[in-house]
Amino acid sequence: MSDFPPRLLSEEQHLLSGCLAQDRQAQFRLYQQYKAAMFSSALRILGDRALAQDALQEAFVDIFQGLAGFRQQSTLGAWIKIIVVRRALLTLRREQRMEVYDQDRHPEPLVAWHDNLTGEALDKAIGELPAGYRAVFCLVEVEGYAHGEVAEMLGIAEGTSKSQLYHAKRLLQRKLHYLYQ
């Protein structure tokens, strides 16, 4: 039994049917319906608006190409979020490889950062977490997913999700300790 009202399910089914039939208006409505929430998820993982927008566009290409494979074991929104998160993680890994290559050629000088704004400091500290830690932290602490759901989304064990969250929190505490002194 579903927790969603029948009207909502039939609207989602109608939208899905239109997208499967390559109806451009249905595809546009699907994109419009989910773009803001999915952009926020990608942005939290990537920490860069341009990269998040690129990842979102690539994810929606993946979504439209893979819609026939949607088995309706979850809501359409949950399935879309999994694809967006995975695409954002792929983008993050690609960018990190490019960044390492770039730093080898042009090392940047060390820059001291002195943020007085807690929100900015937290955003920066989250952005500096290793990719896996950041993804798990954002999905559990910001998005509110359970470890089982995160494990499924990221293709990791539930214990790994819990461990990565623990280590992410420890790193954040160390990075932000100066705010509480």
Segments the model singles out, each with a brief description of its role:
Residues 71, 93, 129, 134, ...:
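Short, Lys/Arg-enriched C-terminal cap helix and immediately downstream tail that follows
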Residues 40, 54-61, 74-86:
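Structural recognition of an alpha-helix C-terminal capping motif at a helix-to-coil junction
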Residues 31-49, 66, 126, 177-178:
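Amphipathic, Lys/Arg- and hydrophobic-enriched alpha-helical face
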Residues 48, 146, 155-160:
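Helix-turn-helix DNA-binding motif, specifically the short coil turn and the N-cap/start of the second
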Residues 81, 91-113, 117:
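Short, basic/polar amphipathic helix motif occurring as a linker/hinge flanking DNA-binding modules
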Residues 20-21, 44-47, 57-75, 94-96:
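Sigma70-family region 2
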Residues 136-140:
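A short pre-motif secondary-structure segment
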Residues 16-40:
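A short, charge-rich alpha-helical start-of-domain segment used by transcription regulators
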